[in-house]
């Protein structure tokens, strides 16, 4: 292994070694407090063993965030004999993924403790999934992409089914596993067809062969269908979306957040690496597929969400529609502004999702999960600050100024108009107007309905502070979006140019 290989994969090595050490340590430390064992608690009010794992994980994730941010100005590196690439695009997405997992753990701690689920295996599985996201985001080879995808997916299957005494959780885990395996099979079959035609697993070599007009494009187009189908499942877009509502609703909210936030960034990276970096010469084949998937997702997601009374199920259909917007940004022909708009949308959607599910966990307590609209009734009368946080998140998801969601949607719509897809932009606007109904309905029940039962707030003061900062960021980036936009544009431009 050469020196620059080690430098390129150093954060991944740190995460891998630390996760393995935590996995071994978790075998020898007490997991929970029981009357018979009388396990002593630490300053975090958790069993000492789990508290150590939790604290060490938080410190490591903070280090990784700074490590990736510090690499933003580095030139692109291809390491490990072409298997792995480190570029501004991957460094930005990996930093955002670290932040997403970090915030998810902070929000989840009290929620999991109240349900006797705050165990070291939850943290280790989350870290393994994060490692898979890193490998997937930096994949420069079909084999690396697939291994990263599976390393990300397998721990999430276990997370979804971790509440084994709940029928809904087990059912959601089985559905997620079976459909996820099917989607992985689609993706692997499509990749094998690409390999059969091009004779290479390297993305750069595949691009060169695909760009050759003498190559049989019919076979590649056939494989492309399977690749897009696999990507559609990972992005949870129509018609490969049927698992999303059941998984969101059937799992503990902390687990829902783990699969609803950071993995979306990795799925976006997979979409970009395969379709733009590798299969851009087949634009005429995959662009109509993305148009169909995006429009169906916008319409089906927003219309179906109107009928939902379970907030998590509503947010599942909302996620389907939001991913439709991400796909719309990929329709422009080699336009770095359009691709960066799509990247900006994915990052800001994850930021808003963190705040939304974080609020649901703060409003939950031992023996009660805040998951329905009835549970939010009258929130403003009891806890006006948290009602305001929810208002900010709903405004952002709906795309209402001055939140970041408005800026993100506007950027994608501008890219569509510039690419002469005005009709699709009109459909997207109409779908967003439909979607605004159920977001505003949440605000209505919080501010104008009378509470049906006692509304309480749980969670540590630190978690509440992070949630408040989360909502402030959603507003601040919406008012001053230039910083994050320029980061996305610079990362996308340098990645496309290979510098």
Swiss-Prot record:
Keywords assigned: Cell inner membrane, Cell membrane, Membrane, NAD, Quinone, Translocase, Transmembrane, Transmembrane helix, Transport, Ubiquinone
Pfam family, one: Proton_antipo_M
Protein's UniProt keywords contain Protease: no
Top-level taxon: Bacteria
Transmembrane stretches, start-end: 9-29, 49-69, 88-108, 122-142, 143-163, 177-197, 218-238, 252-272, 280-300, 314-334, 343-363, 386-406, 423-443, 472-492
Record-level GO BP terms: ATP synthesis coupled electron transport
Enzyme Commission (EC) number: 7.1.1.-
Main location per the UniProt record: membrane
Gene Ontology CC terms, in alphabetical order: plasma membrane
Location(s) in or outside the cell: Cell inner membrane
GO molecular function per UniProt: NADH dehydrogenase (ubiquinone) activity; NADH:ubiquinone reductase (non-electrogenic) activity; quinone binding
Catalysed reaction, written as an equation: a quinone + NADH + 5 H(+)(in) = a quinol + NAD(+) + 4 H(+)(out)
Listed InterPro entries: NADH-Q_OxRdtase_suN/2 (IPR010096), ND/Mrp_TM (IPR001750)
Membrane topology designation: Multi-pass membrane protein
Similarity remark: Belongs to the complex I subunit 2 family.
Listed HAMAP family: NDH1_NuoN_1
Function, as annotated: NDH-1 shuttles electrons from NADH, via FMN and iron-sulfur (Fe-S) centers, to quinones in the respiratory chain. The immediate electron acceptor for the enzyme in this species is believed to be ubiquinone. Couples the redox reaction to proton translocation (for every two electrons transferred, four hydrogen ions are translocated across the cytoplasmic membrane), and thus conserves the redox energy in a proton gradient.
Known partners and oligomeric status: NDH-1 is composed of 14 different subunits. Subunits NuoA, H, J, K, L, M, N constitute the membrane sector of the complex.
Name of protein: NADH-quinone oxidoreductase subunit N
Organism expressing this protein natively: Polynucleobacter necessarius subsp. necessarius (strain STIR1)
């Amino acid at each position: 292994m050469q020196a620059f290989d080690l430098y390129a994969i150093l954060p991944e090595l740190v995460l891998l070694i630390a996760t393995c050490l935590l996995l071994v340590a978790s075998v020898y430390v007490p997991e929970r407090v029981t009357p018979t064992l009388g396990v002593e608690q630490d300053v975090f009010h958790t069993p000492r063993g789990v508290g150590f794992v939790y604290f060490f994980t938080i410190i490591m994730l903070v280090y990784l965030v700074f490590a990736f941010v510090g690499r933003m100005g580095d030139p692109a590196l291809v390491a490990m004999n072409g298997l792995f690439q480190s570029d501004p695009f991957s460094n930005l997405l990996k930093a955002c993924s670290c932040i997403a997992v970090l915030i998810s753990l902070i929000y989840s701690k009290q929620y999991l403790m109240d349900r006797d689920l705050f165990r070291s295996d939850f943290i280790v599985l989350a870290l393994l999934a994060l490692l898979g996201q890193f490998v997937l985001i930096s994949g420069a080879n079909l084999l690396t992409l697939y291994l990263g995808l599976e390393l990300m997916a397998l721990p999430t299957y276990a997370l979804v089914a971790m509440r084994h005494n709940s029928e809904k959780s087990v059912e959601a885990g089985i559905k997620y596993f079976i459909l996820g395996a099917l989607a992985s099979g689609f993706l692997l079959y499509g990749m094998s067809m690409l390999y059969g035609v091009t004779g290479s697993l390297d993305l750069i070599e595949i691009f060169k062969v695909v760009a050759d007009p003498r190559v049989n494009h019919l076979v590649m187009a056939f494989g492309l269908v399977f690749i897009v189908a696999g990507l559609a499942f990972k992005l949870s877009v129509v018609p490969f979306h049927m698992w999303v509502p059941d998984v969101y609703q059937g799992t503990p909210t902390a687990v829902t957040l783990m699969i609803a936030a950071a993995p979306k960034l990795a799925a976006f990276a997979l979409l970009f690496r395969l379709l733009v970096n590798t299969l851009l010469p087949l634009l005429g084949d995959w662009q109509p597929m993305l148009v169909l998937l995006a429009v169906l997702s916008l319409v089906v997601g927003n219309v179906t969400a109107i009928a939902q009374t379970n907030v998590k199920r509503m947010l599942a259909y909302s996620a389907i529609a939001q991913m439709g917007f991400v796909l719309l940004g990929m329709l422009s022909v080699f336009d770095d502004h359009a691709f960066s708009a799509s990247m900006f949308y994915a990052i800001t959607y994850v930021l808003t999702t963190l705040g939304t599910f974080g609020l649901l966990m703060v409003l939950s307590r031992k023996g009660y999960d805040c998951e329905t609209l009835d549970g939010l009734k009258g929130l403003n009368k009891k806890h006006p600050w948290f009602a305001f946080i929810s208002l900010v998140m709903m405004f952002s998801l709906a795309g209402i100024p001055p939140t970041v969601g408005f800026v993100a949607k506007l950027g994608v719509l501008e890219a569509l108009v510039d690419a002469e897809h005005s009709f699709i932009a009109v459909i997207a606007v109409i779908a967003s107007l439909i979607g605004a109904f159920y977001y505003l309905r949440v605000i209505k029940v919080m501010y104008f309905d009378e509470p049906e039962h006692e509304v309480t707030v749980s969670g540590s003061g630190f978690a509440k502070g992070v949630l408040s900062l989360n909502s402030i960021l959603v507003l601040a980036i919406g008012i001053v979006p230039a910083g994050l936009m320029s980061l996305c544009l610079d990362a996308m431009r340098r990645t496309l140019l290979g510098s």
